């Protein structure tokens, strides 16, 4: 009686399983991170290198720019982080920490690679200057509206007095 073990199919399956076993570690090593995962890793690196007392957590991730498909090419990133209530000395994920009320907000820009094996980050952070720039824009627009409003009021006053006719005594 002939069994499955005697046939060539067992040898083929063994070869397929062997090839799969050899290629699986390569797939794990060459794992490609998503844009958000790469930024979260960058935040972890920032927390490790920071001399501030508390951890920072991702507050806002600016929209992903259009990028090429090469995970080894550095990708531009822009995001804000905010100080949390968790001390940097404890081993805790920043996502587990609440934001500190009136905590420091930093705007970060730089590049990351999506290839986890490369793990390349070039990020610099400053106090959130965009808020100051946004305030400047708001003040400029408000000033322009005030000037337009004053011009309109001036024109109305001019029109009002222009319509008045001098009174003559009879």
Curated annotation (Swiss-Prot):
<dbReference type="InterPro" id="IPR018216">
    <property type="entry name" value="Cathelicidin_CS"/>
</dbReference>
<feature type="disulfide bond">
    <location>
        <begin position="86"/>
        <end position="97"/>
    </location>
</feature>
<keyword id="KW-0929">Antimicrobial</keyword>
<feature type="disulfide bond">
    <location>
        <begin position="108"/>
        <end position="125"/>
    </location>
</feature>
<keyword id="KW-0391">Immunity</keyword>
<protein>
    <recommendedName>
        <fullName>Cathelicidin antimicrobial peptide</fullName>
    </recommendedName>
</protein>
<dbReference type="GO" id="GO:0005615">
    <property type="term" value="C:extracellular space"/>
</dbReference>
<dbReference type="GO" id="GO:0061844">
    <property type="term" value="P:antimicrobial humoral immune response mediated by antimicrobial peptide"/>
</dbReference>
<dbReference type="GO" id="GO:0050830">
    <property type="term" value="P:defense response to Gram-positive bacterium"/>
</dbReference>
<dbReference type="GO" id="GO:0031982">
    <property type="term" value="C:vesicle"/>
</dbReference>
<feature type="propeptide" description="Cathelin-like domain (CLD)">
    <location>
        <begin position="31"/>
        <end position="131"/>
    </location>
</feature>
<keyword id="KW-0732">Signal</keyword>
<comment type="function">
    <text>Antimicrobial protein that is an integral component of the innate immune system. Binds to bacterial lipopolysaccharides (LPS). Acts via neutrophil N-formyl peptide receptors to enhance the release of CXCL2. Postsecretory processing generates multiple cathelicidin antimicrobial peptides with various lengths which act as a topical antimicrobial defense in sweat on skin. The unprocessed precursor form, cathelicidin antimicrobial peptide, inhibits the growth of Gram-negative E.coli and E.aerogenes with efficiencies comparable to that of the mature peptide LL-37 (in vitro).</text>
</comment>
<dbReference type="Pfam" id="PF00666">
    <property type="entry name" value="Cathelicidins"/>
</dbReference>
<feature type="signal peptide">
    <location>
        <begin position="1"/>
        <end position="30"/>
    </location>
</feature>
<dbReference type="InterPro" id="IPR022746">
    <property type="entry name" value="Cathlecidin_C"/>
</dbReference>
<dbReference type="GO" id="GO:0050829">
    <property type="term" value="P:defense response to Gram-negative bacterium"/>
</dbReference>
<dbReference type="GO" id="GO:0045087">
    <property type="term" value="P:innate immune response"/>
</dbReference>
<keyword id="KW-0165">Cleavage on pair of basic residues</keyword>
<dbReference type="GO" id="GO:0042119">
    <property type="term" value="P:neutrophil activation"/>
</dbReference>
<keyword id="KW-0964">Secreted</keyword>
<keyword id="KW-1015">Disulfide bond</keyword>
<comment type="similarity">
    <text>Belongs to the cathelicidin family.</text>
</comment>
<dbReference type="InterPro" id="IPR046350">
    <property type="entry name" value="Cystatin_sf"/>
</dbReference>
<dbReference type="GO" id="GO:0001530">
    <property type="term" value="F:lipopolysaccharide binding"/>
</dbReference>
<feature type="region of interest" description="Active core">
    <location>
        <begin position="150"/>
        <end position="162"/>
    </location>
</feature>
<keyword id="KW-0399">Innate immunity</keyword>
<dbReference type="Pfam" id="PF12153">
    <property type="entry name" value="CAP18_C"/>
</dbReference>
<dbReference type="InterPro" id="IPR001894">
    <property type="entry name" value="Cathelicidin-like"/>
</dbReference>
<keyword id="KW-0044">Antibiotic</keyword>
